[in-house]
Amino acid sequence: QLNLTQAPFVPDALHDLALITVFIRDNDAHAPTQIINIAEPDPAATWALRVYSTLEGLTIPNVPKHQSTLSPRLGQWADQTADYPNHDMAGAVLDTAEVDFYAYDWSRTVQQTKLGGWPGTVQSEPWWVHAKTQDTWDLVMQIENEPKAGWNGWGDGAAYIARSRERPHLWAIDVQFT
């Protein structure tokens, strides 16, 4: 759950939102439904996302008792860190024939849960770059493992979540892991 009103940086694709809540079942984390429509949720989807344009009227419920290994935690926003496309995404911003994009000092991708920036990919560019839709997808968040919260859903990987520019009720996820 991300309170965007407190974030030090909010990607342009999220400026109309105040709060995002992401739900991913740990047993579906490796093969989630790729695109979801939050205007018409599919009950068979393996992940869900709720968005709120304002915090007005929202309340913080008591944490229910359950057997989950997940631990509710209040996270803290870290300072912004500039990041850059890695070798999987370099072709989006430069001529890869002219630059050694494998050089350590060239590609500084932030490998942590974050809003916006460039995806710190594990295997390839996110699949939505090649999706057979008319949508332009903007990466809005990357979710890494969060050991303090008990979330290790992707082993040594991450999930990348994007939002459609043309149809903002469509959201995409790409999960990569080793």
Predicted regions and their residues:
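Preference for intrinsically disordered or flexible, low-complexity segments
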Residues: 1-178
